[in-house]
Amino acid sequence: TIELLKQLQQYKEIIETHLIVTKGAEMTLEQETDYTLEQLYAHADEVHDNYNIGAGPASGSYRTMGMIVIPCSMKTLVGIVSGYSDNLVLRAADITLKERRKKISLPENGLSRYGNLSNNRCLCWQEYIMIIWKRNS
């Protein structure tokens, strides 16, 4: 995730990155990397609270180029596929699908069981995606 944010910073003139971090992602960052949450935040143009369901990315009128979910946990994948939007990540993904914007989901390692593959197929069928990037005006 941090590497992707660093790469996207090269295109600051045309891409503004917005970051939403789930509790699970916070735990993964802490347990599996040497990065702090503050270091992750430093690479995004704007950070949104995952529990603020009224934030800009939750609205179809909030114009974005698309969304990337990385890494995408099974819980998040199922939420996106089923349309269950109880947090900002899921709501933003739902809006991204509804508005037919570009979307990318990069599942975590180990999501290769049959049920997980079925959810990935559903997501591909829906033309799915999440970081959110917003077009600069």
Q: Language-model segments: which ranges?
A:
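A cross-family phosphate/adenosyl-ligand binding-site feature
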Residues: 1-104, 108-137
